[in-house]
Amino acid sequence: MVNTDFEKIYLNQSRAGGRMRIAESGLGWKASASSGSTSQPFLLPREEILIASWSRGSKGYELRVQTKNKGVVSLDGFDHDDFTQLKQELTRNFHINLEHREHSLRGWNWGKTDLARNELIFNVNNKPAFEIPYSDISNSNLTGKNEVALEFNLDNNKNGDEIVEMRFYVPGTIENETTIVKNETNGDVIEEAVVNETSAAQQFYEQLKDKADIGQVAGEAIVSFSDVLFLTPRGRYDIDMYPSSLRLRGKTYDYKIQYEQIERIFSLPKPDETHHLIVLQIDPPLRQGQTRYPFLVLQFVKDEETELELNVSDEDFEKKYKDRLKKTYDAPTNVVMSHCLRGLTERKLITPGAFQSRYLQAGVPCSVKASEGYLFPLDRCFLFVTKPTLYIPYSEISSVVMSRTGGGVSASRTFDLEVNVIGSNQPHVFSNIDREEQEFIESFCKEKGVKVKNEEKIAKARLAKALEQEANDDDDEDADMGSAGDEDEDEDVDFQSGSDSDVAEEFDSDAAPSSDDDEEMADSKETDDRPPKKKAKN
């Protein structure tokens, strides 16, 4: 048995090149060791191969293989000289002919679509301009009367930039069905044919959903929920849960979400004591045009009950789901939904922690800019719902600042919580929080090791310090002014009574003047003829 190898071949637009091998048993591909890729080897049995085509590709020439059950396989990077050898090997091993296909290079953006077995082909002048494998399409939506939008899967293993959305303008109408209507006139029955027309865009959308397997997933749904209210994105959707993904079917939009896209599941009682919220954090997010939805917010009435049984056989349940799900449920709808999501996604269900508000609730009402919602201080993060939904882990918070802004009565009743995030200059500000919740939130943040700055307490402390300093300054001034009186009352340590050095009249008002003093006074009268000085007026 002779094998034929081709080097530097890229499988389905992969980042890394590899080796392609053709053998009698089938076709295989393996990433080269030098690329450092962790991709698993790809094997395609010969019985899966239907037809093959040869055309220009992005890295040279491309081999496209149509299969029975594995979609279309793209192998890019061949040289022009490889065509002859490749054709011989495919004929010898698989008994298929290698068709040479030329692409249209006119550059027109109008043409005809061909919904083939494994891919959508856009033809211009009867030549393919491009092909879109159905496996690359994640969602399709009728965004207007004549417009259909396609959303594509994001694959981190592909090289370079990726297209994420494409829209087709499909004008016109199509006669769909003819209905016979019977009318009675004067006792006679008259049959009239009524032609039902639908838009061409609607027809294209329905056909694409069937071909691309968007509207339904292969196999039966394990569990289904109908008419579930979504706050984000707004609307009501039917939810079908399958082994590896779930479907959201609404009036306008349909979505397919892989369980691996779901990163976190929150189950939170709404502080209004009437509703319960389930929040799904997904990556990559859902898209509606240019709008991205990284969080899905579901709302349930607390008293609503659901009774259901899983749509799986007893054997499959015992083998696959026994440790994750229950066979039957009879409980509030939000509890059933949470348990099913946790079991199928194998993600932890995040519920309220130790925080309780003044009214013994898990969250507090507040506002983000002009949007009202609820802030939930959970064990590891702040979560604000509903719009915009904000997820802030405590590990990413540098500090929180509590402050009151504005004036008047309202300022004394509410406060603002400013959350500063590490590496960001734009804080998250939650305003209009009830003033009575400040103590509860502050103590909870300190328990979680979050640095808290209370501007009101800081201002009061500064004011008290300033008043204390001012009082100390006043005491010092009073002490300086009272020092003279203290000196009069203190005993003079230099004074010695009975000492000869002390003159009696200096200390005794009754002492007689000495003779020396009399002589000095007489001399001064004789020598000083100047007029006496005037006394200063007080």
From Swiss-Prot:
| Compositional bias of kind Acidic residues | 470-494, 502-521
One example of the protein's molecular function in GO is: DNA binding
Superkingdom: Eukaryota
What InterPro entries would the database entry show?
PH-like_dom_sf (IPR011993), RTT106/SPT16-like_middle_dom (IPR013719), RTT106/SSRP1_HistChap/FACT (IPR050454), SSRP1-like_PH1 (IPR048993), SSRP1/POB3 (IPR000969), SSRP1/POB3_N (IPR035417), SSRP1_DD (IPR024954), SSRP1_sf (IPR038167)
Q: Which SMART domains does its entry note? A: Rtt106
A cellular-component GO term for this protein:
chromosome, telomeric region
PANTHER family, alphabetized: FACT COMPLEX SUBUNIT SSRP1
What is its quaternary makeup?
Forms a stable heterodimer with SPT16. The SPT16-POB3 dimer weakly associates with multiple molecules of NHP6 to form the FACT complex.
Protein name as catalogued:
FACT complex subunit POB3
**From which organism does this entry originate?**
Candida albicans (strain SC5314 / ATCC MYA-2876)
What gene is this protein a product of? POB3
